[in-house]
Amino acid sequence: MGNSKSGALSKEILEELQLNTKFTEEELSSWYQSFLKECPSGRITRQEFQTIYSKFFPEADPKAYAQHVFRSFDANSDGTLDFKEYVIALHMTSAGKTNQKLEWAFSLYDVDGNGTISKNEVLEIVTAIFKMISPEDTKHLPEDENTPEKRAEKIWGFFGKKDDDKLTEKEFIEGTLANKEILRLIQFEPQKVKEKLKEKKL
């Protein structure tokens, strides 16, 4: 997307990222230098993205979730993210405005990219999320959502869908905005990602 490899971030991309995220010019410029050091080509691969995510969760297995996050931001499906896509991915998974976040969450759950979500797709993402929850934390989850299957069932039940029904983006966003319980169940906001962003160690 037109990222310069000379070591300076283009003014257009800088302005766009400042507009779409809460990051400052200094933060973005600093991350860009680090990004180029790690990825001299100016692009990050699925494997590299997975490795970065793994650093946040040394005691868990974030590979599956990281792959889904990567897929949802790889807009042109070329198997890489440029700096802009990478920063937006980190922003959306750690902060993000609710509506933007829900649009992203829909694309995360729409595993096959066909514009609707099935119950099986919900289970696939929830299973990936559970791999990042420590066994200790899992013990503290309510009885009706302490396994991926139970949580997927609970989410699907909130939307009032039959097992073989599909969920559109409009239904997903409206349903989630109307019910904070769904919002809590569908998202996973890694606190460690937020902490790393604050430390500017990405």
From Swiss-Prot:
Expressed in the retina (at protein level). Expressed in the pineal gland (at protein level). The record marks 192 as: Interaction with GRK1. The N-terminal glycine is linked to one of four different types of acyl groups. The most abundant is myristoleate (14:1), but 14:0, 14:2, and 12:0 acyl residues are also present. The Ca(2+) induced exposure of the myristoyl group, known as the calcium-myristoyl switch, promotes RCVRN binding to the photoreceptor cell membranes only when intracellular Ca(2+) concentration is high. Homodimer; disulfide-linked. Homodimerization is caused by prolonged intense illumination. May form a complex composed of RHO, GRK1 and RCVRN in a Ca(2+)-dependent manner; RCVRN prevents the interaction between GRK1 and RHO. Interacts (via C-terminus) with GRK1 (via N-terminus); the interaction is Ca(2+)-dependent. Ca(2+) 1 binds at residues 74, 76, 78, 80, 85. It is found in: Photoreceptor inner segment; Cell projection, Cilium, Photoreceptor outer segment; Photoreceptor outer segment membrane; Perikaryon. SMART domains: EFh (SM00054). One of its GO terms (cellular component) is photoreceptor outer segment. Changing residue 190 to G: Reduces interaction with GRK1. Ca(2+) 2 binds at residues 110, 112, 114, 116, 121. Residues 24-59, 61-96, 97-132, 147-182 form the EF-hand domain. The modification Cysteine sulfenic acid (-SOH) is found at residue 39. A lipid is attached at residue 2 (N-myristoyl glycine). This is Recoverin. Keywords: Calcium, Cell projection, Disulfide bond, Lipoprotein, Membrane, Metal-binding, Myristate, Oxidation, Redox-active center, Repeat, Sensory transduction, Vision. It comes from Bos taurus (Bovine). Residues 191-202 are annotated as: Modulates EF-hand 3 domain calcium binding affinity. Belongs to the recoverin family. One of its GO terms (molecular function) is calcium ion binding. Changing residue 39 to A: Increases calcium binding affinity at EF-hand 3 domain; induces co-operative calcium binding in non-myristoylated protein. The keyword Metal-binding applies. Residues 189-192 are annotated as: Interaction with GRK1. Acts as a calcium sensor and regulates phototransduction of cone and rod photoreceptor cells. Modulates light sensitivity of cone photoreceptor in dark and dim conditions. In response to high Ca(2+) levels induced by low light levels, prolongs RHO/rhodopsin activation in rod photoreceptor cells by binding to and inhibiting GRK1-mediated phosphorylation of RHO/rhodopsin. Plays a role in scotopic vision/enhances vision in dim light by enhancing signal transfer between rod photoreceptors and rod bipolar cells. Pfam families: EF-hand_7, EF-hand_8. PROSITE patterns: EF_HAND_1 (PS00018), EF_HAND_2 (PS50222). EF-hand 2 and EF-hand 3 domains are the low-affinity and the high-affinity calcium binding sites, respectively. EF-hand 1 and EF-hand 4 domains do not bind calcium due to substitutions that disrupt their respective Ca(2+) binding loops. The cooperative binding of calcium to the EF-hand 2 domain following EF-hand 3 domain calcium binding requires myristoylation. Calcium binding to the 2 EF-hand domains induces exposure of the myristoyl group through a protein conformation change, this process known as the calcium-myristoyl switch facilitates binding to photoreceptor cell membranes. GO terms for biological process: phototransduction; regulation of calcium ion transport; regulation of signal transduction; visual perception.
